[in-house]
Amino acid sequence: MSPNILIAYYSFSRNTENFALEIALQTGGELREIVPEQAYSFDYNTATKEVRAEIERGYCPQLISGGEPIDAYDTVFIGSPNWFKSIAPPVLSFLRAHDFSEKTLVPFCTHGGGGFGEIERCIAQECSGARLIPGLAMGGTIDEAELERWLDGIVR
């Protein structure tokens, strides 16, 4: 396992988790799931209402996982679903819980057709002291060849 790479992610429906797992397999990085204290509803329609309300008011939920120190890592992959063109609130909590100065940040996201939306801009805004590498956005299935090409330009 690479001691210098962290893959931190939040996943609602396991799509982002699968993306994070593949990044970990190909980089040897350490996985860290970002888990909010209060889980979202299992009902999709209810969950989307909860998420939209949180995003609109800029809410950052408390985390039960994701607040652990990141000092040992030089490169941090940050994964989020694209929710209403925004970063998932638990990922925003993760960003605000840490100092990313002088770290390399690599965003990745899953989406249902909206690409990155405002996720890269949000990460750049929240982590102004970091070096931001262009990320990768994928729909429901992971294109392993595309992922490998992207990672080749970052960690190999």
What feature does the model see in each segment?
Residues 1-78, 85-87, 92, 96, ...:
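N-terminal beta1-alpha1-beta2 submodule of the flavodoxin-like/Rossmannoid cofactor-binding fold
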Residues 5, 105-106:
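Hydrophobic beta-strand segments of well-ordered beta-sheets in folded domains
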Residues 27, 98, 127-130:
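A structural signal for short coil/turn segments at secondary-structure junctions
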Residues 78-79, 107:
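Redox-cofactor binding/interface segments in oxidoreductases and associated redox assembly factors
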Residues 81-84, 112:
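Short glycine-rich anion-binding loops that position phosphate/pyrophosphate groups of nucleotides
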Residues 106-143:
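Short, glycine-/small-residue-rich phosphate/pyrophosphate-handling segment
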